[in-house]
Amino acid sequence: MNRKLMSRSMLVVITLSVVPWCWLPYLLTAGEEACFYCGMKRSEHGHSWMVIEYDDGSSGGFCSLHCASIDLALHTDRTLIRILVADYYRKNLIEAETAHWVIGGAKAGVMTTRAKWAFESKEDARKFINDHGGKPATIETVLKAAFEDMYGDILLIQKKRKTMHMHKLKTDHN
């Protein structure tokens, strides 16, 4: 076992006995940019990544509009400066206010049952709609939809995690 992996493993073992479980996703992705709430890595979700910046200088990176919406709801005491979102195709961060959004369609969303994707150009948004369905939307529309979808999305996430846990237990016993 190499030194880096060994020290990371030791850190996780020691930390699990001291730090609350809510920090586990963050600790397991140490050294990588990962979503504060679910631990999903930017390297795997660069097409849906979001960054929120507040007036107090704080900011956060999130795997999806779902997790970014949670952050917005929890930080109503801060003034929002801007929201950046990844262009679906290019994965570069763009202003969420000026992005061309698509809501719905056949392409599965990240952490949600109703997908919400951002595009830098109107042409790319149209191409996506032609290929996968969905409707054009604004930032206001997708944020409202994210909050409307929250309860159902949380139930879906819990169900998926339970299924993954049961599958892991099953394979560990075989």
For each feature predicted by the language model, list its residue ranges:
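Intrinsically disordered, low-complexity linkers and terminal regions
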Residues: P20-G61, L65-N174
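N-terminal Sec-pathway targeting helices
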Residues: N2-V12
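Bacterial N-terminal signal peptides
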Residues: V12-P20
